[in-house]
Amino acid sequence: MNNQGRSILAWAALFIFVILLFNVFQSDGLLGVRNNITFSDFLTRVDERTINSVKIQGRVIEGTSNDGSTFSTYSPDYPDLVNRLTSNDVNIEVVPLETRMNTFLGFLISWFPMLLLIGVWVFFMRQMHGGGKAMGFGKSKARLLSDKGPKITFKDVAGIDEAKEELTEIVDFLRDPSKFQKLGGKIPKGCLLIGPPGTGKTLLAKAIAGEANVPFFSISGSDFVEMFVGVGASRVRDMFEQGKRNAPCIIFIDEIDAVGRHRGIGMGGGNDEREQTLNQMLVEMDGFEANEGVVIIAATNRPDVLDRALLRPGRFDRQIAVANPDINGREQILKVHLKKIKYNSTVLARIIARGTPGFSGAELANLVNEAALIAARLGKKEVDMHDMEEAKDKVLMGVVRRSIAMSEKEKRLTAYHEGGHALVGLYCPAASPIHKATIIPRGNALGMVQRLPETDEYSQNREQMESSIAVYMAGRVAEEIIFGKNKVTSGAASDIKGATNIARAMVTKAGLSDLIGPIFHGSSSDDMYGRQQSNEISEATAKLIDAEVKKIITQGYEFAKDILTKHIDQLHTLANALIEYETLSGQQIKNLLSGRALDSEEENKFPFNDAHTIKIDKEKLHEKTKTTKAQKENIAS
């Protein structure tokens, strides 16, 4: 049992002892055991003259018999009691109520609240600050990683080989510094892991702890600043002193953006305390005193908010980007996590990796775990590929909401809405392939068309972005064509938002507007309160931007309308199939519209000869929505 458990048991035993002591004194247990008798029996003994003396305190009567035995009883409101006792020669002693309580017991009860408060305060001070150091607020909360338990090594980290190589070099330096010092090299003072959430930054730190044969301390950025002024700076000093005593060692600071934000962007005492903590960290990392052998490794997914002084060489010499894995990285990560579950030969890591572009390592781990849970729920002994597909749909599209009972009218409208998305997506050559279309409510949506790129995408061209806008607008267009303009629903609100975001990014960030040109008009850096500031633009330019955004969205709207009008029969076919089957894969949709068997696995290049025709129509639509010179002058005025 650890010290904390023994301390809790000791305080519990003390509390029980005090309660027992209270009961003992209250029952006069230390003064002898008294025989309780009834009041009628007491009166009989008085009349028989067998009672020598009594002590009366309120309604409690304690007495001594002629043979020396003691007794006690409780008296009702009996006016003739005293006369009856004196007539039978019984000695009477009357005691005030206030003096009945034992002196020690009274002292204990009067001081008990104060003693309890002192005891609780001492208890918490011991627990929070290392066993009795009541003023230990400034002590570092860095935890030394124990050698007990399973170790995570670089073998458990997959898909981020570049980051592993950089960190392996640091581990090698700590193990054998002479190898690098022969050439005059110095160990890096700090290493910053940068990347989106779930890419394995903390896992890398755990692997370093498992690989390095040196002490490894870990702490969170939020552990420095608390309620007392100066605590953060004191904890930073104590952390580095702890590191120097155990050098060579590694100190890992997770989520360093909690304490390392830009100085001067906030107001108030809390911000001053955070800046004081950051200043102390800057001095400790690269100040007058050297920290030989103490390597700082930090992780963050917000490098844009970190102070520039923290990022300079000499503090964080290396900044390692930990990005989402590519298809090969995803395959390696899946193989690592598949080792932990039972699966059959139908599960192919390469196929799963190809169908999960953009997934982080944490999302892939969650995918494998969800598949195992689905298989267990169905009573299977092994996970198969169908379970993996179900898990992927759950992660991508959300949990199926079986509690929602859609009417036939809503189901029909949703089928045409999602059918419009899917059909336009098939006829847009630059759009990402359709993964699945469903009218089963998932997450916050009544239906969904999920698109997945065939390869990892790191940028998009104009045609891809325009195709995405057309696919976004296709659901609303389908509702308008089938049910009329007055029957269009609010279900396309999120689609309109997505299309607007893409169009505005094309105009203000990517420079893909001929009218505005390659000029950046997006949001700039944070202001002093941490809010995003937009670039200063004139009112005329703002109107031009709005006009260009509207033009691009209208162009996508007309493009989608042209496709759906031309292929209205296919829209009806697809919508009816969604009503019947509720969920269709991209391959099933192609088979359906090509007249093949729904579950045919033959390669199907759909559409056949329509892509060129649609491209020509798109150019006509561009001419239709083109901003004329007169319109430009009107907007500018």
Curated annotation (Swiss-Prot):
Binding of Zn(2+), residues: 417, 421, 495
Subunit structure: Homohexamer.
Residues where ATP binds: 195-202
Ranges of the Cytoplasmic topological domain: 1-6, 125-637
One GO BP annotation of this record: protein catabolic process
Role summary: Acts as a processive, ATP-dependent zinc metallopeptidase for both cytoplasmic and membrane proteins. Plays a role in the quality control of integral membrane proteins.
Membrane disposition: Multi-pass membrane protein
HAMAP family noted in UniProt: FtsH
Species for this entry: Rickettsia typhi (strain ATCC VR-144 / Wilmington)
Name of the molecule in the record: ATP-dependent zinc metalloprotease FtsH
Compartments (UniProt record): Cell inner membrane
Stretch list, region Disordered: 617-637
